[in-house]
Amino acid sequence: MKLLILGNHTCGNRGDSAILRGLLDAINALHPETEVDVMSRYPVSSSWLLNRPVMGDPLYLQMKQHNNAAGVMGRVKKVLRRRYQHQVLLSRVTDSGNLRNIAIAQGFTDFVRLLSRYDAIIQVGGSFFVDLYGVPQFEHALCSFMAKKPLYMIGHSVGPFQDEQFNQLANYVFGHCNALILRESASLDLMKRSAITTDKVETGVDTAWLVDNHHEDFEPGYAVQHWLDMAAKQKTVAITLRELAPFDKRLGTTQQAYEQAFSGVVNRILDEGYQVIALSTCTGIDSYNKDDRMVAL
């Protein structure tokens, strides 16, 4: 069997890297004969972090080219794509509506052809399908449907769902994939609250917890060993922080309020006799400098 794992992972972010590594380790443990290719928006840094070959994401490259198009026509096309491209793709998948006869960008056609090489597609988590990220998040899934390939969505958090066009695509994609495996229950609550189909939902975990610990052959570097020694001295809680934007307005809070609340949490942890270590889970590679993911243990 030949699988393709795709999604917005390992972009200089150790949390995303752990999500992918956990899935790869689990597949290797359960079905070592399976051939697995990995695709990322940032193949060079991802390959370095994972210590394995990684393919570039052609849809991401196409999006960058379209967004950087110069001149008046370039700007007009960008507006039209933003408004109609996802509807054209959905019409192609369902073979319905007037938009199904409109030509799609060559990058989509080439990507569908690439997907035909695989037996199944896995779109790995974590928080990828968020309405504030927009409808382009569904392009890989729609292309998988056009290629008529099984699509498994593993280890996801989804929602909120407060945009009509986003909800339309979420309903179709989540209802037609082979499985939508969620890593927590809050996403399921959001889906039910917004009337998003839950027929394909399964309860799962964050695949980062499936990473092989490599106890026998693990050799920590100087920095890692330093923090391991620090954590061994007393009871320890590790935290990671983030910049809230653009979610601060959605959450009805501010960066300052978030930081003040977190400082209160830290003080209570200290009062319980723990030490607190703040860790960055991001590398800064490929311009990904936001420390906004879980601590990947």
Regions found by a protein language model. Give the residues of each.
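Active-site anion-handling motifs in enzyme catalytic cores
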Residues: 1-297
